[in-house]
Design a protein with these regions (language model features):
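N-terminal Rossmann-like NAD(P)+-binding subdomain of aldehyde/semialdehyde dehydrogenases
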Residues: 1-105, 133
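Substrate-binding/gating loop at the entrance of the active-site cleft, primarily
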Residues: 97-113, 117-137
Length: 137
């Protein structure tokens, strides 16, 4: 499957995800946290391989630091997941309600983000941060 086909599939799934109740989205965030902890050693081993390859290719120290995913970064992302679960549902909030004219009202309501594309380099923690924010919202 290429990127265009994957994008089409995502667009088809987006309305289903957008309709998920907050309880289900929060359970998904909790499950991500659980799975990260359950697979921590596999994740760390994969990261060690990435770091080794980066070192062989003389990657800059600043990039090496960003590429590192260790116990501290795992603790950070799992704490972020917990914090995100505790936030109120961002969907369906009225942020503006204005009578423009007789019979004409302007209302701004928050809605799900939808399908996004992200390019990031050397930040394994970014995957969890970005995907969890999208899931919550």
């Amino acid at each position: 499957m290429n990127i265009r086909e994957e994008t089409k599939q995502m667009k088809l799934a987006a309305p289903l995800l957008a309709a998920m109740p907050i309880e289900q989205r929060n359970r998904a965030l909790a499950l991500i946290k659980t799975r990260l902890n359950e697979h921590r050693e596999e994740i760390f081993e994969a990261n060690r391989k990435d770091l080794s390859l980066a070192l062989e290719n003389h990657v800059a120290p600043a990039v090496m630091k960003r590429l590192t995913f260790d116990e501290a970064k795992l603790a950070d992302v799992t704490q972020e997941l917990e914090s995100l679960q505790s936030l109120p549902d961002p969907i369906g909030k009225i942020t503006l309600h204005r009578q423009l004219d007789e019979g004409l009202t302007l209302t701004r309501v928050t809605c799900p983000i939808g399908v996004i594309g992200v390019i990031f380099e050397a930040r394994p923690d970014a995957l969890v941060q970005i995907s969890s924010l999208c899931l919550k919202s």
